Amino acid sequence: MVFFRSATFELLLARSRGVDMPTLEKPSYVQAVGLLLLAMVSIQSSGTLAKVLFNEFPVLTVSALRMLLSAVILALIFRVWRINFKQVRWKAILSYGCALAGMNILFYSAINRLPLGIAVSFEFIGPLGVALYYAKQKYDFIWVGLAILGIILLFPFDAAAEALDPIGILYALGAGAFWAVYIVAGQKPSGISGNHTVCLGMFVGTLILLPILIMSPGLSLVFESPYWFYFIALAVMASALPFSLEMIALRNLSPLSFGTLTSLEPAIAALSGFIFLSEQLLWTQTLALLTIVAASVGCTVTTQHARQAREKAEKIKKANKADPS
């Protein structure tokens, strides 16, 4: 989101719906950038930890249990018991939770078959596509072209190089598709604040994956040391810690700065895979990753500028109507 979105779009959603921002001293811009980078490192490192757990547990078990623990942790942080359930629009929550579950389980399946940076790059096509769909500008063709070029470069053309797993690619693209659905579903009014929407959505996603968790072989092994600690660490690194850091960072970051910086996540994912998992990328794949990052940054900047221009034009139009003279 990118790993489980993760946290980036959830946090923007929560912020847009009136999240209860903690009463903390506003950080400087440099501190805010540092906190956001630390949050992204936490998210992508959680993907690395998940790949380690795949050696001991089925992918579906890791995915389902991680989502369950994350839901519990965020419920405690956001005090889910304060929700007025009479106001909840369950149709929006259900679509949001289904998108979360699909995105989570398909991405974990993807990183089980692909290098972390490659999987994140393919998944990133989902939100990039949504952004480009809603941004009708002349610059859009540049970002679409860069994204397509990046996808092409992801494939190893060297015959001696190890080919990418086609099933893994499909999983990553599927995760990206669910990520796109997740973004659209997150814009639907749920009747409650953004933080509570995230909590209920995660519990819905957990319920969807619960049968998988119950039927998982070797489930009792999860409760043995040190695996229980690993799963808690996975949930904290993927949700609780980045949420907290990004909440503080957003106090002194514009949406443009936030969106541009989070476009670096594919690169951070690749670096995490290289450091912790010794995952090597071809130079063409590294170039592809940077190309997709550039497309995302460019899309973020031009979309934000276009939005600001529209808002300015609307204000001028309203002012002219109010003062016909």
Describe the residue ranges of each PLM region.
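Hydrophobic core positions of alpha-helical segments in small-molecule transporters
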Residues: L38, L65, Y96, F122, ...
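Hydrophobic alpha-helical transmembrane segments of multi-pass integral membrane proteins
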Residues: V30-L35, T61-L76, D140-L146, I167-Y171, ...
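A helix-boundary/kink motif common to multi-pass secondary transporters
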Residues: P58-V59, P115, S193-G194, S254-P255, ...
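Glycine-/small-residue-enriched transmembrane alpha-helix faces in small-molecule transporters
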Residues: M1-T61, S95-C98, G102-L106, L149, ...
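Specific alpha-helical transmembrane segments that line the substrate/conduction pathway
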Residues: T61-A64, L68, Y108-K138, A175, ...
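Hydrophobic alpha-helical transmembrane segments of multi-pass membrane transport proteins
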Residues: L37-S45, L49, I77, L94-S109, ...
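C-terminal-most transmembrane helix of multi-pass membrane proteins
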Residues: P22-E25, M67, Y227, S263-S325
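Hydrophobic transmembrane alpha-helices of multi-pass small-molecule transport proteins
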Residues: L74, C98, I125, Y139-D158, ...
